[in-house]
């Protein structure tokens, strides 16, 4: 749908901003700034100016959230005018401060930001990208990786949030409608978002670096002047994940996976040290695989990241404003995994199975296996991303709420696929009981009527379902390489069959667990540990 060919060769387009154009309209009664907040802002400005990354990270991850809880739980941080004179009108710090300011508004203010604030936030991002992208040499700015990830993630989130806000015409005043439809057509425009993310990827040469690393070469050789700096390199990497998310929100799942091609999705890398980034990547990759009917790849993606979350949750449980998002995405991935296991049964790790049992997913999985379409729909609507339309409603559209149109479209696409497979779990359950089974007998089981009442049409319908079973159980499965789109056709069913005249011949293809290899590895590991302990003596 959207690819690199859509963008101008000169790269990033500069969206100017007249600072006096919009009055930040948040209704914030004046109150004196607390002394702790003043000291924090002055010190924060100082460490950013001096590039003390460790201290910046400490202030960003710990002090800022703590002060937000203490003084600004349900109100905005001090305005730009109140802060600027404290930091000697440091323009770069003010851009970074306003990024946190508007992020706080989106996260904490119950009624949400006003239209003016949404526009101001967009122009502030423009100022930031105008500062780092058109530069002829790398800017002297160092920020911790967690901030860079959350900056890109928030940029995409605010685009998504604005697209939904823009589609909700029923609660807008005439003035807001005029501002949205006539005066701000480029604000949070999809091409602008893609333009920024692709420009960051291009400037950092992150794809070349990832390909060089995969080939065993030094990424520095191809990084270029900008890509050698951690600031640009990590922004480029996180922008790839941002593009994955944007294309998923638009329903372009092929492009979502394709944009990650330099990244070996199923392998850990030096870039996977930000838990929220790794979890978000797996969520959108797994969802894209599911919508492309690549259930084996989706199950492997979800199972792998859910195991990672189980084992590392204590490491990040008290970090970052994104913890609520991580917890929600974890719950969503269990729902998506349950859907995939119903549509494409296969063995998964026992600890994941245990969670599915403990949280009562099995009851709903049983309903889905019995063809309960409403349960499928409920699971999908809860677990899917908040889809958006790339374009606003037309200016002459009736005043209505269009925000659910994108979700309803994707839900209908998914439910069409489910309806095609509705009879397959029942067919599978009967086939597993036999090695040979007459077509007439299976048709009788399926329709719950005596065999002598089965007509030709019933047999034809059954043959259609059996052909569907063969087709749906054959999927492309990733085997190796950096492209998540490539793979080999494999049968995902634990049984196979062929039809000879009026008889179905069934073979169980389930591979038994090889416990011997597991114990051999553990014994060898124990012997190695024993040798090391003896050497210490």
UniProtKB/Swiss-Prot annotation:
Keywords: Cytoplasm, Initiation factor, Protein biosynthesis. It holds the Pfam family Paf67. The lineage of its organism: Eukaryota, Metazoa, Ecdysozoa, Arthropoda, Hexapoda. This is Eukaryotic translation initiation factor 3 subunit L. Its main location: cytoplasm. Component of the eukaryotic translation initiation factor 3 (eIF-3) complex. It comes from Aedes aegypti. GO terms for molecular function: translation initiation factor activity. GO terms for biological process: formation of cytoplasmic translation initiation complex. Component of the eukaryotic translation initiation factor 3 (eIF-3) complex, which is involved in protein synthesis of a specialized repertoire of mRNAs and, together with other initiation factors, stimulates binding of mRNA and methionyl-tRNAi to the 40S ribosome. The eIF-3 complex specifically targets and initiates translation of a subset of mRNAs involved in cell proliferation. Belongs to the eIF-3 subunit L family.
């Amino acid at each position: 749908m959207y690819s690199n060919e859509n963008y101008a060769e000169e790269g990033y387009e500069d969206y100017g901003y007249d600072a006096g154009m919009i009055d930040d309209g948040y209704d914030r009664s004046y109150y004196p700034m607390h002394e702790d907040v003043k000291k924090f802002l002055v010190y924060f400005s100082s460490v950013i100016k001096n590039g003390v990354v460790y201290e910046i990270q400490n202030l960003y991850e710990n002090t800022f959230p703590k002060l937000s809880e203490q003084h600004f739980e349900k109100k905005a941080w001090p305005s730009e005018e109140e802060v600027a004179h404290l930091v000697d009108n440091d323009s770069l710090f003010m851009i970074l401060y306003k990024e946190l300011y508007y992020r706080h508004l989106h996260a904490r203010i119950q009624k949400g930001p006003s239209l003016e604030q949404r526009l101001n936030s967009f122009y502030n991002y423009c100022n930031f990208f105008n500062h780092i992208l058109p530069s002829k040499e790398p800017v002297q700015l160092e920020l911790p990786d967690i901030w860079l990830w959350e900056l890109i993630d928030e940029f995409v989130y605010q685009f998504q949030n604005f697209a939904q806000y823009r589609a909700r015409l029923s609660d807008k005043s005439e003035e807001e409608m005029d501002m949205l439809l006539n005066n701000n057509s480029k604000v949070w425009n999809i091409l602008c978002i893609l333009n920024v993310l692709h420009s960051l990827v291009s400037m950092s040469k992150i794809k070349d670096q990832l390909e060089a690393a995969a080939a065993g070469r030094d990424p520095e050789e191809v990084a270029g002047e900008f890509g050698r700096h951690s600031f640009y390199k990590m922004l480029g990497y996180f922008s790839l994940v941002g593009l994955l998310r944007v294309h998923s929100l638009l329903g372009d799942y092929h492009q979502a996976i394709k944009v990650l091609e330099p990244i070996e999705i199923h392998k850990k890398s030096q870039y996977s040290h930000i838990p929220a980034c790794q979890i978000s990547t797996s969520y959108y990759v797994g969802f894209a695989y599911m919508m492309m009917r690549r259930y084996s790849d989706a199950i492997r993606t979800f199972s792998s990241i859910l195991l990672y979350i189980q084992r590392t949750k204590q490491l990040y449980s008290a970090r970052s404003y994104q913890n609520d998002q991580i917890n929600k995405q974890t719950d969503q991935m269990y729902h998506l995994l349950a859907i995939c296991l119903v549509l494409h049964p296969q063995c998964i790790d026992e600890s994941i199975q245990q969670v599915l049992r403990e949280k009562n997913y099995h009851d709903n999985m049983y309903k889905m296996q019995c063809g309960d379409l409403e349960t499928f729909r409920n699971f999908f609507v809860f677990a899917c991303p908040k889809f958006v339309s790339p374009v606003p409603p037309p200016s002459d559209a009736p005043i209505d709420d269009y925000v659910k149109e994108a979700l309803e479209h994707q839900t209908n696409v998914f439910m069409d696929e489910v309806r095609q497979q509705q009879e397959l779990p029942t067919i599978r359950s009967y086939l597993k009981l036999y090695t040979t089974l007459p077509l007439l007998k299976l048709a009788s089981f399926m329709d719950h009527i005596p065999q002598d009442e089965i007509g030709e049409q019933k047999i034809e319908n059954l043959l259609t379902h059996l052909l569907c079973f063969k087709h749906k159980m054959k999927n492309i499965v990733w085997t190796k390489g950096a492209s998540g789109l490539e793979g080999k056709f494999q049968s995902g069913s634990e049984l196979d069959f062929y039809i000879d005249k009026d008889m179905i011949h069934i073979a169980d293809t389930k591979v038994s667990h090889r416990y011997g290899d597991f114990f051999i590895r553990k014994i060898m590991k124990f012997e190695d540990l024993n040798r090391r302990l003896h050497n210490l003596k």
